[in-house]
Structures are given as structure tokens and as C-alpha cells.
Amino acid sequence: MNKKIVMAALLGMSVMAVNAANEADGDSLRMEQLQEVVVKGVWVQKNAPFAVANIKKDELQKFSKTGKELPFLFSQTPGVLAWGENGLGTGTSYLRIRGAGDSRINVTLDGVPLNSPEDQAVFWANMNSYSSLLGGVQIQRGVGTSTNGDGAFGGTVALSSKTPSEKAGGEVNFSYGSYNTFNVGGAFSTGLLWNHLIFDGAYHETNTDGYIHGTSGRSGSYYGGLTWIDDKFTIRYKNIGNFEKTGQAWNAVTAGNDDLSLMDGTYGSKTGIKTYKDLYDVGLGRYNSLYEHFTYDADGKFVRDANGNYQTERYVMNNGEPWDKTTDNFWQNHNILSAAWNINENWSTTASLHYTHGYGYYKEFRYDNKIKKLGLPSPEFNGDALGGAKRTDWVRKKGLKQDTYGLVWNINYKDNDWDVIGGLSVQQFDGNHFGYVTYLSNDALRTLLMKNGDYQYYDSDAKKFDGNVFIKALYHLTDNWDAFADIQYRHVNYKTDGYNDKFIYDEDAYLYKKHYLDINEKHNFFNPKAGFSFHNGGHRAFASLALSHREPERNNYTDNGNYPAPKAESLLDYEMGYSYATPKWRAGATLYYMNYDNQLVQTGAKSDIGEPLTANVKDSYRTGIELTAGYDITPWLTVEGNAALSINKIKDFDEFVEDWDDWKDNPDAAKYHCDGNGDELRQFHYDNSTLAFSPSAILNGFLNFHYKGWQAVWHTGYVSRQYLDNTENKDRSLPAYSTTNVNLNYTLPLKAIGVKEAIFGVNLSNIFNARYANSGWVYSAIAESYGHTNDNRYYQIGFVPSAGFTAMGSITLRF
């Protein structure tokens, strides 16, 4: 009923708006020019010496009808990977550029930082259908130009909001497809009122059952804007809200449980399970250990049916009802007040005040966990009062309340010789982390702990100040040569205190005890950049050198496990590129060498809520070549492609591995310390090993047919092998994969019935039904008493797969 009301309201507003409309283009030149002023501070200047990919408004609007998150559109550009937990591209999704994950990618909206200050990542599940609100995106690979917020260590994503239309109009859309996935939405603009004022709004929502069991969810966004515009000045208020309740699968698809791995070779077994496809073939392709567990027989062995498929069953609460699912619940509201002024033909300026409030929590069922892992304050909770019980089921609620506010300001000067931008950004973050146990299956423990209906087991506060100032200038040396220089100073102060959500194992007391956080870290970073560019006719060439620094993120302090305290990292990025374009064909190549000091690299491990964990390595690098090409075969048929070929290495790497046996009397064991669970650690050294999650080849090919109202796009992508840790071990890796998608659209004018046009679309994904995983995690250990030496470790892999063939149809009505 609520969805029907929303759609009716959107349709009504659109119809009222069209009654006032004129037959004219809705996006005026002056609005576009003023929007360029707003984003100028973070977008690469024309002819600046950096590698970029631009995504236009039309592509963004078409993509918005799929319900997928933005990373899946970005993955069509060179060197970019995307994946999502539920297998469909909706909800919890992730992004990598040149092998660097979300927390290393700077993201802004109209120059305002979007990265979570503590985690330094953008949570794309909280940005569902954002593409419908955008007028353009620029992806800068490498360090790129100076920006606001966290340092770019793989790339920068600069989002530009869609300019409000000066002509009244609107649209509504509906999409439906596989796994009961549907997207509804609409947008409207009042057009220009009283020659100066525009009110516009939008609402979009995506629902899905999810491919992976227990990942059904609902997420969406809403937008309301008020714009005052004059010929050279505009002031605009944007309120963008996001909501989500999405089923989680951060454990991914696993071969077994916490105690037993079904991966081939563990404990000497020959299961034949090495890849995600192998799991799919034994009935575990959609298995989610956050939602269900293996079925056991009377002897404690896994049950299989007549076809050899492993059987699973839902978790059950004390009242006999099945546990619904593990969910991520989050609400976020962005408020941005921006002003832009074209002062004269040389000078322009823009300023934005921003405030974001967010609140949310995970809710998760923990099956048969050790009671002492709750970090309880007294030994009595592990004694006779519990009837000797050592394990219990429990539900935890881990949450965050946060407020972020700040100012972004830019001043720009441009004449025939100079293009200069000065920028200032200050931002303050205040957050509170909390965790409650809301259910315990052990009656005695519930009576002792949950006197008020729940038990708070951690609480901590956090504050982070982030400020930067920069100036960048492009100087036209001649008609064909430009010089570029960019200097940025950035100051960061991060504080947190209180109890962590992780507990420390006390070997003497055989208990887990609370871990108190007391962090006060300050960083001062100087980030210079310089380069040259050449342009003549269709030829363009550039070379640049850029330095960037980045502070550790929150989980580097709270989840660093076996590794020493985290350090800030730095990156020296060398880039060189050439491109040539004619009216019919175009081609380009970019060479890069990214040299890291103390890079925080992914270890293949994850936190207990699915965050990828990282650790410092002293010397590492990423180097490669990125190729693009396109040819217009006819006016209605185009072939395009891009390729990213790379080498990603750690020069010297020390790995710490759990040893389940007692190594106290073994002189050959290079012990480091205990891991917090009472297991000893062994240290192994590697030279020139491949960085985790860094495929050596990412390829994309497109065939685009467009004739009158018809459009069809064929897209085939290929990703080479990815190692899940930094040891370059093939057993702990994801095989290469290739997928093909087809998108079809037809635009039908319907002005005779009061509709500007109707757009019908069909999106066909993975048409050859490939069974593959595009991300994952790994755990490995040594247990020589069970035959698991370092060369033959016990290991468990969590595979993050994509669904097989899926389809979605859509219809959009524009007024």
C-alpha cells in the first residue's frame, strides 16, 4: 500500500509539473555553467596530466533503472572491479580501483566528502539509486588531483549532482526482474518559478529477495532541493536521505563451518571442493552461514542427499521460530547548502556548508558461541551458575550514531594563460559505537545478564577532525604545451576512547576480557603534484608525479590482530599517457608506477562483520598499462574496449600464521606472540609476492548499436586470477572469470497522450550463466599433528559469488 501511495504521489506531481511545461530542453546553459563552478575544485582541469574516465548523464540515468549500486557502473571503466554480498549488485557492494579497496578511494558529491571519516569508505548500500540524482561522474585513477577528505590511494570518484531543470517536468519508472528484484521511483521539477526559484525532488527504492540465502532487503533514497538562480549566481539546498534494511552475507559462501573445512585436502580429505563452482555443484551455491547451518547426523557428520548435495537448516530461537536473517539497518541524511558565483569572465567561487546525520546497526545471530567470548566481567558467568554450559546462541546488535559537519570553499581564476584553483575544506566527525546482546538461548545466563531486556557489552566514542588547503595551477606554456602544479596540506586528528567490541584473551585466567581503547593520533601531510601535458589536434600526451599520504582507519587499530600498531602510509605515483582521436576512431594508453611506503594491504582476513582487514608492509608497488580504444563502424554501430594490465607486488612481506599445536619446545618455530585466542603464531617471509585482490588483467569489450529509438549494448568482461592473501598461493585464490551482459532499450514518443516519451528496457546479466566468485576471504593455519604443514595448510575460503543468468525489465515515463 505504501509503495502505491508513493507512486501515485510521484505521478501526480509529475503531471502537475508538465501542465506548466514548455516544449523546450530542461537543462539550461547557465545552470550547467554554475554547476561546473561547484565541482571545479575536485574535477581534473582540462589538459591536466592525469588518467580519468568520465561517465555522462545519459549513462547514469539508464543505469538507475537497474537497481544496482554505482560500483557496477564504474566497473565498465579501466582497472575497476565491483562486487556485492547478495550476488545481484544491490545492497552491500564494494569497489576497487587498480586493486585498491573502498577505504582507499576518495569520493565526493559536489566537492563534499562522502567517505565515512573513521572507516574511510563509502557504503554504497546507503546510496541506492544515486545514479538517478547525478549529472556526471569523473573517475581519476591513481592519486589524481587534490581533493577534499581522505587521501586517494587507488583513485578518486567525483560525483556531480544533476542540475535542476528550468522547465517543469517529471518521470516515473518501474523495474522488475530475477529473484523478485524490483525498483520503483520518480522525480519532478517545478521549473523556474518567478524567474529565479526551482523546487525539485525524487524518490527511489529497490527491493529484492537476493541470490544468496537470507539477503533479501529494501533500500532507497530520497531527494528534495530548492534552488535560487540568477544569471551569474546560484544558491542551492539539497537534502538527500538514504535508508536500508538489507540481509547480510559477510561470511560469504563457505565450505563448512567454524570447526570444519570442506576445502579439498583439509585433514587429508578429498572433497574436490576448490572453487565456488565446486560448492555450487554440491548444493552450497547460495549457502549463508549467517542465516543457516549444516545439518548433522547422529554421528555429528554433515548430511547429504541422494544427489550428493549438502543439507542445511535455518537457525532456530528458543520459541521454535526460525531466525529471520542478519541485517544491516542504516538511515542517513545529507544536508548541503551550496553557493556558486561567476564573478566575471576570470573569477568564480563556490562555498558549501554540509551536515550529515547517520544512525544504524547490524543485528546478527551467533550460533553456538563460547560464552567466555562475551568478555564477561566475572568468572561466575562461566561457573556452576550456568549449569556447566560453555556455549550459547546469542543475538548481538552492533551500532553507530554519527554526525559530520563541515565547510568546503573554492576560488577559481582563469584567463588565456592560467587556470588556478584554491581550495579549503574543514570537517568534524562525532560518533558513538555501541553493542548490545538482545537474545541469549542459555536461560541462566539471560537471567544474570539481561535484567533490562538487553546487555551492553561495548561502548566507545570517537572524534575526527580533517582539514586541508590546496592550490593548483595549469599554465599554458604554448598553444600545445601546459605545465601543472598542485600543493596540498592536510591535517588529521583522530580520537577514540571506551571499550572495543573485540576482547583480549587472558591466558592466565582462561577468559576473554574487555579491550579498552585510548587513541589520540595526529597527522600532518604535505601532498605535492606536478606534470606536463601536450595537445595538438587529435593528439594528447601527459606525464605527472604525485605524492599522497593516508592515515590508518578505525579497524586498523581495533582489529589489527597479529600485526604491530598501524602506521600512516604514503604513495608516490608516476603517470604517463598518450591518446589519439579522429572523428571515427580513438585510442589511448596510460603507463603508471605507484610506489608505496607502509602500504596498508589487505591480508585476506575479515573482521567479524565482514570488513576486509589490512596490515602495513614497508615496500610495495603497483605498475601497469591501461588501454582504451573505440571505432565507429557505422553511424549506428560502435565497438569499444578497455584493458588494465598490471603487476602488483610486495617486495618484502612477513606473514603471521596460527599454529594449533604446542610450539613451545620447537626451536624451528619463529614465534611472534599469541593471537588473542591462545594459539601461537609462526612467522614466514616472502620476497616479491603478489598483492591480494589485485588481478593482473581486467578487460572490457562493448558493442553498441543505436538506431532511432533503439539501443542495444553487448558487454563482455574478463578478470584474471585474484589471490586472497599475500602469499601468492594458488589454493588460496579465485580463478579467472568472464561474464557477458546485454542491455536493450527502446524510446517511444507519446506526446499525443501527454507523455513526452516512454522508455522500455531489458537488462540481461551473465547470459552464459557462469558460476564464479569475484571476491572472498581466507583463513589458514598450521597443525602438523593433523598433517597440515606450511605447504599444506588447513584453510577455509569464503566465496563472494555473483548470480547466474538474471533478467530485469523496466519502463520509464517522462513528462
Language model regions located:
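Short, acidic, small-residue-rich periplasmic hinge/interaction motif at the N-terminus
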Residues: 20-62, 102, 586
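Short loop/turn motifs that connect adjacent beta-strands in outer-membrane beta-barrel proteins
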Residues: 28, 164-169, 193-196, 232-234, ...
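Extracytoplasmic beta-strand/coil segments of soluble accessory domains associated
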Residues: 71-113
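Short acidic/polar hinge/loop motifs at secondary-structure boundaries
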Residues: 113-141, 160
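Transmembrane beta-barrel wall of Gram-negative outer-membrane proteins
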Residues: 176-207, 212-251, 255-296, 335-342, ...
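Structural signature of Gram-negative outer-membrane beta-barrels, strongest in the C-terminal barrel
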Residues: 419, 425-427, 452-596, 632-634, ...
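Gram-negative outer-membrane beta-barrel transporters
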Residues: 476-480, 593-595, 615-727, 812-814
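C-terminal beta-signal and adjacent terminal beta-strands/loops
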Residues: 639, 720-724, 746-815
